[in-house]
């Protein structure tokens, strides 16, 4: 009995212990901590370095992630604190750092590589101009370039100076060389005649180098015979085998503007990751990879010597002075848009079919039109707005094309000397108000005769081009639905092919939202020299900003 009394507690204890062990959950597996992305906002010309995402992660453990945007759009995002990035990587940061606001946003910066602006001239045209001899080419000046443009002998492609770094730096190069000043320029120093002469040769605009290269390949020898861009881009184009003939690279004697690709820290909290990435980018192995992969010049002389066979020895000329004066930069952009560039003439083809009433699409379209006729004074807003001397036709359509209405923005006052931002005249404000009122009155009903509307608009632009050949013509069409009235895409292709040759100089840009047939729209822009903008994931007013950079 005593034995039983002793055994029972022991058995209970053992059973309890066994039960406890059986009920215990196994320890959870050790969780692998998530690697935070190190977000970098880069300008679009840096898409060729995207393989660095994987390379940096393997070498440093930092999960690098690029997002890409236009120069001025990205600059504005940094200036306003809306970049949503830990770092920025631009071709240069001279505009960004030209005032205290930009300087306050950038915590650290490291120059990574170099590429000077060059003038690429088709070899046969270089011979005609007497520029083919290396000794002669070495003595050419920005004035020689501007004179050839003025005389119609140099017809070039260039990214929009108001939205892209390379376009802006080329224009600044002309201004700096014409001033003959060794020190920084002011807005009053700008030689207006030099700008006017240079821009007479500007025949192929666009927002980025990729689009311009595609168009240059198609139009080399007919519409254009030169391409002004970074040396690295022109060398890559020469090596592509896609050109009708190679480009001779000219580096004007007075000097050039050079992109130094600063890698800039925006978020102090990510300093450690930034330093790891910057150190990797400046390492000898990465500098060699960048030079060979992108044809940009290493920042280290000893590394540059190892790739000397890839890069023209003439490229690194005197650096033209860049003024930190924001008034000069803003005044130059404003004068380019409103005074010096070939004025814009465009037809906006507006889908007013019944489907546009739903999903807030009508409101979005109306707001977008009102936006370009509004008073947004931001950097990109100034670029997107209707400019002085601009001519605009608004062409609604539904079952059929109807109600074409024309607007013309008057010219502003012209400064006798230098450049400066100017307020809108009362006459301009009246025209902008008329455009906004037109948008307010749009009614949505009926079907979608998209290709009829685009075709009629091209005919209108052709007729206007015959009367006023000095404008930059384009058609911009907005639609949310598949074409279900009038011409099919095949009908359009047939009829387009029968139009006069001059129509090839009028690009058609399509804005896609809703259920529009993306395949057909891409087929249309492929033959008309434009591109498709997708507004299904981006606000339409933001798409408008992008479109304006191509006009």
Predicted regions: what is each one?
Residues 181-249:
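Ligand-binding pocket segment of bilobal, Venus flytrap-like solute-binding proteins
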Residues 296-348, 352-363:
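Acidic, polar low-complexity linker/tail segments
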Residues 479-535, 545-546:
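VWA/integrin I-like adhesion module and closely mimicked acidic/polar interface patches used
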Residues 21-153, 157-160:
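N-terminal segment of the mature folded domain
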Residues 110-119, 196-199, 241-267, 271-275, 280-302:
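Periplasmic-binding protein-like
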Residues 402-404, 411-472, 509-519, 542:
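Von Willebrand factor
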């Amino acid at each position: 009995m005593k034995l039983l009394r002793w055994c029972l507690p022991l058995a209970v204890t053992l059973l309890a212990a066994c039960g406890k062990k059986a009920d215990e959950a196994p320890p959870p597996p050790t969780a692998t901590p998530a690697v935070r992305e190190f977000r970098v906002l880069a300008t679009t010309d840096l898409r060729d370095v995207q393989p660095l995402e994987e390379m940096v992660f393997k070498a440093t453990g930092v999960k690098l992630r690029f997002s890409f945007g236009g120069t001025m759009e990205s600059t504005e995002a940094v200036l306003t604190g809306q970049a949503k990035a830990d770092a920025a990587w631009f071709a240069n940061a001279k505009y960004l750092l030209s005032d205290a606001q930009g300087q306050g946003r950038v915590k650290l910066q490291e120059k990574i590589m170099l590429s000077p602006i060059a003038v690429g001239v088709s070899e046969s045209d270089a011979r005609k101009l007497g520029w083919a001899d290396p000794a002669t080419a070495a003595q050419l000046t920005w004035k020689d370039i501007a004179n050839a443009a003025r005389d119609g002998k140099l017809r070039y492609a260039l990214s929009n100076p108001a939205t892209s770094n390379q376009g802006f730096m080329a224009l600044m190069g002309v201004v700096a060389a014409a001033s003959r000043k060794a020190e920084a320029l002011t807005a009053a120093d700008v030689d207006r005649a030099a700008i006017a002469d240079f821009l007479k040769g500007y025949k192929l605009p666009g927002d980025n180098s990729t689009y311009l290269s595609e168009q240059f390949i198609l139009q080399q020898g007919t519409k254009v015979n030169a391409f002004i861009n970074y040396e690295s881009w022109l060398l890559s184009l020469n090596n592509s085998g896609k050109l009708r003939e190679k480009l001779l690279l000219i580096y004007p004697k007075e000097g050039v503007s050079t992109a130094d690709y600063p890698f800039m820290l925006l978020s102090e909290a990510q300093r450690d990751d930034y330093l790891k990435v910057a150190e990797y980018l400046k390492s000898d192995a990465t500098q060699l990879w960048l030079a060979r992969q992108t044809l940009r010049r290493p920042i280290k002389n000893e590394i540059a010597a190892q790739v000397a066979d890839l890069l023209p020895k003439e490229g690194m000329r005197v650096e033209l002075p860049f003024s930190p004066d924001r008034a000069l930069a803003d005044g130059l952009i404003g004068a380019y848009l409103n005074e010096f560039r070939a004025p814009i003439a465009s037809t906006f083809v507006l889908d007013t079919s019944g489907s546009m009433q739903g999903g807030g699409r009508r409101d979005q379209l109306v707001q977008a039109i009102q936006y370009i006729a509004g008073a947004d004074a931001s950097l990109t807003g100034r670029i997107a707005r209707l400019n002085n001397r601009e001519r605009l036709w608004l062409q609604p359509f539904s079952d059929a094309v109807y109600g074409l209405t024309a607007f013309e923005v008057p010219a502003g006052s012209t400064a006798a000397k230098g450049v400066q931002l100017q307020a809108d005249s009362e006459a301009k404000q009246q025209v902008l108000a008329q455009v906004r009122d037109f948008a307010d009155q749009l009614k949505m009903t009926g079907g979608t005769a998209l290709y009829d509307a685009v075709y009629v608009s091209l005919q209108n632009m052709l007729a206007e081009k015959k009367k006023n050949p000095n404008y930059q013509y384009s058609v911009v069409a907005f639609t949310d639905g598949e074409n279900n009235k009038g011409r099919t895409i095949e009908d359009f292709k047939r009829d387009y092919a029968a139009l006069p040759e001059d129509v090839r100089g009028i690009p058609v840009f399509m804005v896609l939202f809703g259920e529009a047939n993306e395949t057909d729209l891409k087929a249309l822009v492929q033959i008309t020299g434009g591109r498709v903008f997708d507004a299904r994931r981006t606000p339409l007013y933001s798409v408008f900003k992008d479109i304006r950079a191509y006009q």
